[in-house]
């Protein structure tokens, strides 16, 4: 079964994320459990936790269908010790919040070397950051997102993801989330079914589908191989509809959150309905 949804707002309370997901007929959703542009957040109250769990139960969302995202400020590969420690503490807090909410996944951008250390050193720092967080939490899997490779961000090559996983001690609690826009911008073609087959054959060989714990389904305003992260609505960008139809018809993408971060929330319900309709072999544009 495909779990299909969007990254919805949790404004007004975390329980509202589940309510908003249900309103667009989503069978999955993503959310921030705190303000994504601030370091600190008030601890979760018992009331907030209970209301969130109740809303998820009411609308039939299990932890397998929910892909929370951490703060954009966190850089687990930071070259400066003090800043690295700050990011690690914030990441542990994000993991603990997921643990309290009964969530089993935490999606995050791996990190940036800021032109101050080597890629290898940065990737090793990211892996060690994950090890520290896993040691201090239980039941939550760290889900590394591939990036477009803007600036000094790592994670734009499948080899980067594999290197991080290789450095994580508890392989049962690490995974990846593949963002289609990021992959396309990083040079992984998805414009035709044949290119999708090739790209995901590379993924299977280098990383492995056993580590795929989520997807971000985004078309791209950015051009192929541009290393620029600009999302677009499905079928309106440079990837086109075929990739998303191909994903919907491949059972390797079953049982994980497939999350829209497309640019027009007003049509998320339509995009979700379209994706659901592509699951049959006879589906057409």
Curated annotation (Swiss-Prot):
It is an enzyme of class 3 (hydrolase). Gene3D superfamilies: Divalent-metal-dependent TIM barrel enzymes. Its cofactor is Zn(2+). The keyword RNA-binding does not apply. Zn(2+) 1 binds at residues 69, 109, 145. It catalyses: Endonucleolytic cleavage to 5'-phosphooligonucleotide end-products. CDD domains: AP2Ec (cd00019). GO terms for molecular function: deoxyribonuclease IV (phage-T4-induced) activity; DNA binding; DNA-(apurinic or apyrimidinic site) endonuclease activity; phosphoric diester hydrolase activity; zinc ion binding. Zn(2+) 3 binds at residues 182, 229, 231. It holds the Pfam family AP_endonuc_2. InterPro entries: AP_endonuc_2, AP_endonuc_F2_Zn_BS, Xyl_isomerase-like_sf, Xyl_isomerase-like_TIM-brl. Binds 3 Zn(2+) ions. Keywords: DNA damage, DNA repair, Endonuclease, Hydrolase, Metal-binding, Nuclease, Zinc. Its EC number is 3.1.21.2. PROSITE patterns: AP_NUCLEASE_F2_1, AP_NUCLEASE_F2_2, AP_NUCLEASE_F2_3, AP_NUCLEASE_F2_4. One of its GO terms (biological process) is base-excision repair. Coiled coil: none annotated. Zn(2+) 2 binds at residues 145, 179, 216, 261. Belongs to the AP endonuclease 2 family. Endonuclease IV plays a role in DNA repair. It cleaves phosphodiester bonds at apurinic or apyrimidinic (AP) sites, generating a 3'-hydroxyl group and a 5'-terminal sugar phosphate. HAMAP family: Nfo. NCBIfam families: nfo, PRK01060.1-4. This is Probable endonuclease 4. It comes from Escherichia coli O139:H28 (strain E24377A / ETEC). The lineage of its organism: Bacteria, Pseudomonadati, Pseudomonadota, Gammaproteobacteria, Enterobacterales.
